[in-house]
Amino acid sequence: MSVDAATVRRIAHLARIAVTEDEVPHLQGELNAMLAFVEQLSEVDVDGVEPMTSVTPMQMKKRADVVNDGEIADQVVANAPSTEDHFFLVPKVVE
């Protein structure tokens, strides 16, 4: 696959990036180089290779999905200048 100058301009327009006419040939070369690299990756034989999500073996820590109050309501409102029943009190701004 090859990217032409019109495609570079269209990509720039869709991405809302201002690109001058002088920059188009350089960006065209950069995009073509990226696509060539992706094409090389598609040629790699990965038969029998297990998919992985990380380069280091790890297991996700699981916890019970339990609803609680966080047990820190007092700490949260401690920084507020004025509170009532664990709610922040603010001055009335609309009549």
Curated annotation (Swiss-Prot):
List the InterPro entries hit by this protein, alphabetically.
Asp/Glu-ADT_sf_sub_c (IPR036113), GatC (IPR003837)
Coiled-coil residue windows: none
Pfam name, any one:
GatC
Task: List the EC numbers from the record.
Answer: 6.3.5.-
Q: Name one GO biological process term.
A: regulation of translational fidelity
Reactions catalysed, as given in the entry: L-glutamyl-tRNA(Gln) + L-glutamine + ATP + H2O = L-glutaminyl-tRNA(Gln) + L-glutamate + ADP + phosphate + H(+); L-aspartyl-tRNA(Asn) + L-glutamine + ATP + H2O = L-asparaginyl-tRNA(Asn) + L-glutamate + ADP + phosphate + 2 H(+)
Looking at the UniProt entry, the stretches that span the membrane are: none
Print the keywords alphabetically. Answer: ATP-binding, Ligase, Nucleotide-binding, Protein biosynthesis
Highest taxon above the source species? Bacteria
Molecular function in Gene Ontology? asparaginyl-tRNA synthase (glutamine-hydrolyzing) activity; ATP binding; glutaminyl-tRNA synthase (glutamine-hydrolyzing) activity
Record text on subunit structure and interactions: Heterotrimer of A, B and C subunits.
- What family does the Swiss-Prot or TrEMBL record give for this protein? Belongs to the GatC family.
Free-text function comment from the UniProt entry: Allows the formation of correctly charged Asn-tRNA(Asn) or Gln-tRNA(Gln) through the transamidation of misacylated Asp-tRNA(Asn) or Glu-tRNA(Gln) in organisms which lack either or both of asparaginyl-tRNA or glutaminyl-tRNA synthetases. The reaction takes place in the presence of glutamine and ATP through an activated phospho-Asp-tRNA(Asn) or phospho-Glu-tRNA(Gln).
Name-wise, this protein is: Aspartyl/glutamyl-tRNA(Asn/Gln) amidotransferase subunit C
**Gene name as annotated:** gatC
